[in-house]
């Protein structure tokens, strides 16, 4: 970053993080103690987003929300990610997109924290890398994190965002894919409609695949009491 100015350093979780300006743009770069670069966060305008990201956002569920901020995350060895901070009334969400417009995740922004340290690239074990390459050939690695002793890897495969979870010994546990209600088999929808949750609103639908079965997890909400359940 030869044009960097107004540089300020701080330690964040063992990473050395530089906040600076370059050519009038606010940026942040993450390094380890040995000087290895991991990620750069760059503030950009909505107009600077790739056309595919703008098209996906404008066709999505948050199109009517106000875009408050846009960040571009350049990461060592992993996908470039674009983060749109959107708000409506008292609600705020961070929307993560790949360069080709795949919505990777939607995260409620409850604390106003703009730190994207959770998107730092992580090294995967050979067993996990080999499994993903075999089961999802050509998949692109977006993110990986340790969660409750498991390793969760976000990938893009066949134009969709998948979350692949591995447990003890890097054994594959399940893969989750967000789907539309229209993609759910009729028998599953009929079962839901005839259950105690048949009149509840549907918030989200995920398809799970594991080594021994396939199932759907449907998040529902009672419009009267605002109670929520997953069935």
Where are the predicted features?
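Interaction-mediating elements
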Residues: 1-80, 85-231
């Amino acid at each position: 970053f030869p044009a960097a100015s107004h540089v300020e350093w701080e330690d964040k979780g063992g990473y050395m993080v530089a906040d600076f300006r370059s050519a009038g743009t606010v940026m942040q770069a993450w390094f380890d103690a040995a000087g290895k670069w991991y990620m750069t966060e760059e503030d950009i305008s909505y107009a600077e987003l790739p056309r595919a990201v703008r098209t996906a956002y404008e066709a999505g569920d948050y199109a009517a929300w106000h875009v408050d901020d846009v960040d571009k995350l350049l990461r060592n060895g992993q996908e470039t990610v674009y983060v749109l901070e959107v708000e409506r009334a008292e609600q705020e969400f961070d929307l993560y997109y790949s360069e080709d417009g795949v919505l990777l995740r939607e995260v409620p922004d409850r604390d106003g924290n703009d730190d994207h340290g959770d998107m730092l690239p992580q090294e995967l074990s050979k067993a996990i890398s080999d499994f993903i390459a075999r089961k999802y050939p050509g998949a692109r690695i977006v993110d990986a994190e340790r969660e409750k002793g498991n390793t969760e890897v976000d990938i893009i495969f066949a134009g969709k965002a998948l979350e692949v979870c591995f447990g003890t010994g890097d054994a594959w546990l399940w893969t989750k894919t967000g789907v539309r209600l229209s993609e759910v088999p009729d028998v599953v929808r009929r079962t839901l409609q005839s259950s105690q949750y048949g009149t509840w609103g549907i918030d989200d639908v995920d398809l799970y695949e594991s080594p021994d079965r396939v199932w759907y997890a449907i998040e529902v909400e009672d419009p009267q009491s605002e109670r929520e359940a997953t069935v």
